């Protein structure tokens, strides 16, 4: 019995953690595909970036910051926060989307009180699929979910207003979606 317990305890884990180089490589691949995906919008990529929270001491890593500069007289400018989520074997969960939304809301509150630019679009990109709760939560708060699969980005949901004025910016809509 003692030998069996030792062998179980010393057994190497099948779960492999991703190294910095692999994670950075994933982000670079996502960046290349996002340029293609958003090509007609003339994206400018900044990698990595930071977002300040409400008290200024909270500062969040932004995996990829994309600035959209529309063309023409009435062109809008937009700033996109892209979160790259590498998962070993599990799908992206609702809690993963919640963490991104909470960080973005904190950064948005910082900007509304102190001024500056803000991220008006959230995109979550993962190498794994998204579970159904994550997708419904993302749809309710207008977060676009993309899966990076075989070198391509695949849309996993269809939020109504993921560019410009998404629901996650409006506190009452956030609370309704969070409680449901």
Please annotate each region the language model reported.
Residues 1-180:
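Mixed-charge (Asp/Glu-Lys/Arg
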């Amino acid at each position: 019995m003692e030998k069996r317990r030792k062998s179980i305890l010393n057994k190497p884990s099948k779960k492999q953690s991703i190294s910095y180089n692999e994670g950075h490589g994933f982000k670079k691949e996502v960046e290349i595909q996002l340029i293609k995906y958003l090509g007609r919008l003339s994206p400018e990529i900044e990698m990595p970036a930071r977002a300040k929270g409400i008290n200024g001491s909270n500062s969040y890593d932004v995996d990829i910051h994309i600035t959209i500069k529309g063309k023409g007289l009435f062109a809008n400018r937009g700033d996109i926060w892209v979160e790259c989520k590498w998962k070993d074997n599990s799908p992206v969960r609702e809690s993963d989307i919640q963490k991104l939304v909470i960080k973005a809301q904190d950064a948005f509150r910082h900007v509304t009180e102190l001024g500056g630019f803000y991220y008006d679009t959230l995109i979550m990109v993962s190498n794994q699929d998204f579970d159904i709760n994550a997708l419904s939560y993302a749809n309710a708060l207008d977060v676009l979910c993309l899966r990076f699969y075989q070198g391509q980005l695949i849309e996993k949901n269809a939020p109504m207003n993921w560019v410009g004025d998404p629901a996650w910016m409006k506190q009452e809509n956030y609370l309704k979606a969070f409680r449901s």
